[in-house]
């Protein structure tokens, strides 16, 4: 029995990699008549570390599009087992460095030793296209004393591309 479980785990890691999806990905239109806002949002465009040094930490990078203002945002939500106190996010898109400041206003203890840090960052269309259409995108979360690298954003990037090519044209 143990051999079968080990083999099954090994096959799963080979086919799905060390980062698994987190949550159920979807796209929703979030309209609020009280605030007169209308956003098209990715929900749960995340990866989760699994069976490595990043075990069970979740990294979400959702695109938000303000339909009324015709502007885009990156909603970054990091749920980890320890604090980074994120100050900035650095992407490498085919080697080109793209740096975003990260607000220190959005931090919380989720419970059970889990912490969350998030921000909604404005992003212009040219920069968004660089991230979406680059051959390889990596990311570094720079904290006050530490940093953390994500070297495989292919699942997130694939969903960005689908969102950009199929969902956004309906509202532009």
What are the language-model segments listed below?
Residues 1-2:
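N-terminal secretory signal peptides that target proteins for export/translocation
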Residues 57-87:
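Short, surface-exposed binding/anchoring microloops in extracellular/periplasmic proteins
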Residues 29-61, 66-67:
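Solvent-exposed, flexible loop/coil segments flanking beta-strands in beta-rich domains
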Residues 16-33:
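Bacterial Sec signal peptide processing site at the extreme N-terminus
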Residues 5-16:
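Sec-dependent N-terminal signal peptides
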């Amino acid at each position: 029995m143990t051999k079968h479980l080990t083999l099954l785990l090994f096959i799963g890691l080979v086919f799905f990699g060390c980062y698994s999806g987190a949550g159920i990905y979807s796209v929703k239109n979030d309209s609020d008549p009280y605030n007169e806002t209308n956003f098209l949002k990715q929900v749960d465009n995340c990866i989760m570390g699994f069976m490595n040094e990043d075990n069970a930490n979740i990294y979400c990078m959702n695109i938000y599009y303000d339909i009324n203002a015709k502007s885009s945002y990156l909603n970054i939500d990091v749920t980890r087992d320890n604090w980074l106190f994120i100050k900035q996010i650095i992407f490498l898109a085919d080697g080109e460095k793209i740096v975003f400041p990260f607000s220190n206003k959005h931090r919380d203890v989720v419970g059970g030793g889990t912490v969350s840090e998030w921000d909604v960052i404005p992003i212009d269309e040219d920069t968004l296209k660089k991230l979406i259409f680059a051959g390889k995108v990596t990311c570094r979360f720079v904290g006050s004393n530490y940093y953390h690298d994500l070297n495989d954003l292919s699942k997130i990037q694939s969903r960005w591309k689908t969102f950009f090519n199929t969902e956004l044209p309906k509202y532009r």
